């Protein structure tokens, strides 16, 4: 089942103002954190979600961009839309402490994965929290975090280091 073009285009045209229009589709460019930052700067965004087989291909002429959230198929674009809404919302002022955003995976400063996180107890089934994190030496902790971020990125997402 393919969704008709006419009701979707009418809905897009009825939106007050000029929202940035995105069609969610497996054929779109892959969504990344850099796109979240770009969308954060937009005044408004309209997300078009297909379902089952998607939407009439003519819709592509009425949107600004086509985005895919990954190389997999969902039954509909609603979950993909929620992913985009969440990733953009958390970048809005006041949503999350701006200092916290700087050290996250895919931060604008460095494109590394975030360093490993630990909590209590210090030892769990013979696995211990790294001693440097218990040292209280913030300079050493910062160096450890940076090194671990690079290690994790190299291990899990080497494509980010290119």
What are these model-predicted stretches?
Residues 1-51, 56, 93:
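S-adenosyl-L-methionine/SAH cofactor-binding core of RNA-modifying enzymes
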Residues 10, 14, 83, 87, ...:
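Alpha-helical scaffold segments in soluble metabolic enzymes
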Residues 18, 42-43, 62, 147, ...:
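Structured helix-beta-strand junction loops
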Residues 21, 96-102, 158-160:
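Short, flexible loop/turn segments with low-complexity composition
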Residues 55-101:
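Structured adenosyl-cofactor binding patch, chiefly the S-adenosyl-L-methionine
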Residues 79, 91-131:
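Internal, active-site/partner-interface "lid" segment
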Residues 121-162:
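SAM-dependent methyltransferases
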């Amino acid at each position: 089942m393919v969704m008709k073009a006419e009701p979707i285009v009418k809905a897009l045209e009825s939106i007050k103002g000029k929202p940035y229009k995105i069609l969610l589709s497996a054929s779109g460019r892959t969504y990344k954190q850099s796109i979240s930052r770009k969308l954060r700067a937009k005044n408004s965004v309209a997300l078009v979600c297909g379902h089952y087989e998607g939407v009439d291909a003519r819709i592509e002429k009425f949107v600004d961009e086509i985005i895919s959230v990954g190389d997999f198929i969902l039954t509909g674009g609603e979950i993909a839309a929620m992913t985009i809404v969440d990733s953009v919302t958390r970048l809005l002022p006041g949503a999350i402490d701006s200092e916290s955003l700087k050290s996250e995976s895919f931060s604008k400063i460095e494109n590394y994965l975030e360093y490993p996180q630990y909590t209590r107890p210090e030892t769990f089934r013979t696995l211990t929290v790294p001693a440097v994190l218990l040292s209280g030496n913030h300079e050493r902790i910062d160096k450890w975090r940076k090194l671990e971020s690079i290690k994790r990125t190299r291990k899990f997402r080497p494509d980010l280091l290119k």
